[in-house]
Swiss-Prot record:
Reactions catalysed: carbamoyl phosphate + L-aspartate = N-carbamoyl-L-aspartate + phosphate + H(+)
Assembly notes: Heterododecamer (2C3:3R2) of six catalytic PyrB chains organized as two trimers (C3), and six regulatory PyrI chains organized as three dimers (R2).
InterPro entries found in the cross-reference section: Asp/Orn_carbamoyltranf_P-bd (IPR006132), Asp/Orn_carbamoylTrfase (IPR006130), Asp/Orn_carbamoylTrfase_sf (IPR036901), Asp_carbamoyltransf (IPR002082), Asp_carbamoyltransf_Asp/Orn-bd (IPR006131)
One GO BP: 'de novo' UMP biosynthetic process
UniProt record similarity statement: Belongs to the aspartate/ornithine carbamoyltransferase superfamily. ATCase family.
Organism (species): Ehrlichia canis (strain Jake)
Name listed for the protein in its UniProt record: Aspartate carbamoyltransferase catalytic subunit
């Protein structure tokens, strides 16, 4: 395995290996591991990012890699160079791994056809997929609940435009989770792997073991999709009162960025969610992905995991 473009590219053995390596890093049993010493990793983010970019950079540097993040605003793309030509030039410099985020669906898969002798990671492409975030959520749920099979997982928010929802549905349904979607009719879509679609928040969370909230993707939403953010929050914001209808041990998740007061209240986000645990898990998962793509289950013998 030398690319991570979408969830379907992962075998069960890949996922299990990534989980096991993640747990080693998460529990700090490999904090001095410099397995990527001498490797060059290039981050190409054509779309804004806080958590994904920062956690990849931290993972890369923690593992000893030479980490380079191209500033798109000062790159030759602003002089008319195409994205493909940019990739071809970066590839000619012989990096070991390129991590790409783009606002265009399927662009990363297209780019991978032009790249040789280099690993590629999709860090999110349009509304297509965000496989590393799905792996973070999978590892977080498995860490807290031990098993995915037969869990009731409700995903609430802007499903229509969400690459996180698509990747999570594809991954979690493979392991026997019962996936429900909660959204206004204009932001819902029927995806393979989904058991139920609800348009009422309370109905959708009553039996949930996990509630995964998503922001409104205002950069992709047209004005006619929802009347207003205020109307959306009135019907779909998860607050303490609405949360009381869910199971007492329900896990509240959010991939970020959160828009508090819209899809989640301040109290629920800050006191009842595992959002920051997901962020912490994100560094460990991305370390594990870098490790696995470049070395598989093998370890640098001087820095055993």
């Amino acid at each position: 395995m030398n690319t991570l473009l979408e969830i379907s590219s992962l075998t069960p053995d890949d996922i299990e290996s990534i989980f096991n390596i993640t747990m080693q890093y998460f529990n700090n049993r490999s904090q001095n591991n410099k397995i990527l010493n001498g490797k060059v990793v290039v981050n190409l983010f054509f779309e804004s990012s806080t958590r994904t970019l920062s956690s990849f950079e931290i993972a890369e540097k923690s593992l000893g890699a030479h980490s380079i993040t191209l500033n798109i605003n000062t790159s030759s793309i602003n002089k008319g160079e195409s994205i493909i030509d940019t990739i071809l030039n970066i590839n000619a410099m012989n990096p070991d791994l390129i991590i790409i985020r783009s606002q265009y669906s399927q662009l990363v898969k297209t780019i991978s056809q032009y790249v040789s002798n280099c690993c590629i990671i999709n860090a999110g492409d349009g509304n297509h997929e965000h496989p590393t975030q799905a792996l973070i959520d999978y590892c977080t749920i498995r860490y807290l609940k031990k098993n995915i099979s037969n869990l009731n997982i409700s995903i609430c928010g802007d499903i229509l435009h969400s690459r996180v929802a698509r990747s999570n549905i594809r991954l979690l349904s493979r392991y026997g989770a019962n996936i429900s979607l909660i959204a206004p009719p204009t932001l819902a879509c029927d995806l393979v792997g989904v058991s139920h679609i609800y348009h009422n928040l309370i109905d959708g969370i009553r039996d949930a073991d996990v509630i995964m909230l998503l922001r409104l993707q205002k950069e992709r939403i047209t004005n006619c999709v929802i009347p207003s953010e205020e109307e959306y929050s009135h019907l779909y914001m998860l607050n303490s009162e609405r949360l009381s209808y869910a199971k007492k041990d329900v896990i509240i998740m959010h991939p970020g960025p959160t828009n508090k007061g819209t899809e989640i209240s301040n109290n629920v986000a800050e006191n009842k969610s595992v959002i920051l645990l997901q962020v912490k898990m994100g560094v460990a998962v991305r370390k594990a992905i870098l490790h696995y793509l470049l070395y598989g289950n093998k370890c640098n013998t001087s820095n055993e995991i």
